[in-house]
């Protein structure tokens, strides 16, 4: 605990805050080729690589991810949620923030059911996160 004199000499410093999804906080003005600080909730990008990765201990699986070049010029790794996907190289995807705890370096998620990404087939519960329309009711 500092004394009053110590606080008079040196003020308390506010903690510096660092964003968890830096690629979403950077835009680019293509007319003047300048980086802007306009943040966005999602970004569009093109897949440069679609592959699998093994998670950290103690988990074991083959998690699907895509390397995505965004419209602001950055290249990031994005997790592909759900069972099965149709993504290939050059697929156009929409990404959102949100890390995958057991995959190092993966801080974004691909949004299913938009652009070139199809929704998860035969999904009936928790559909909105996986881009699935409401199934038709049989009479």
Curated annotation (Swiss-Prot):
The gene is rpsL. Belongs to the universal ribosomal protein uS12 family. The lineage of its organism: Bacteria, Bacillati, Mycoplasmatota, Mollicutes, Mycoplasmataceae. GO terms for cellular component: small ribosomal subunit. With S4 and S5 plays an important role in translational accuracy. Interacts with and stabilizes bases of the 16S rRNA that are involved in tRNA selection in the A site and with the mRNA backbone. Located at the interface of the 30S and 50S subunits, it traverses the body of the 30S subunit contacting proteins on the other side and probably holding the rRNA structure together. The combined cluster of proteins S8, S12 and S17 appears to hold together the shoulder and platform of the 30S subunit. This is Small ribosomal subunit protein uS12. It comes from the Bacteria. GO terms for biological process: translation. CDD domains: Ribosomal_S12 (cd03368). Keywords: Ribonucleoprotein, Ribosomal protein, RNA-binding, rRNA-binding, tRNA-binding. Part of the 30S ribosomal subunit. Contacts proteins S8 and S17. May interact with IF1 in the 30S initiation complex. NCBIfam families: rpsL_bact. One of its GO terms (molecular function) is tRNA binding. It holds the Pfam family Ribosom_S12_S23.
């Amino acid at each position: 605990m500092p004394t009053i004199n110590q606080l008079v000499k040196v003020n308390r410093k506010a903690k510096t805050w660092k964003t968890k999804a830096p690629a979403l906080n950077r835009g680019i003005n293509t007319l003047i080729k300048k980086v802007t600080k306009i943040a966005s909730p999602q970004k569009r990008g093109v897949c440069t690589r679609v592959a699998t990765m093994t998670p950290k201990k103690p988990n074991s699986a083959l998690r699907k991810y895509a390397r995505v070049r965004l419209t602001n010029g950055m290249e990031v790794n994005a997790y592909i949620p759900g069972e099965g996907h149709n993504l290939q190289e050059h697929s156009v995807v929409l990404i959102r923030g949100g890390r995958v705890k057991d995959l190092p370096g993966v801080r974004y998620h691909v949004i299913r059911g938009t652009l070139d990404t199809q929704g998860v087939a035969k999904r009936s519960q928790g559909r909105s996160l996986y881009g699935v329309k409401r199934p038709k009711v049989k009479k």
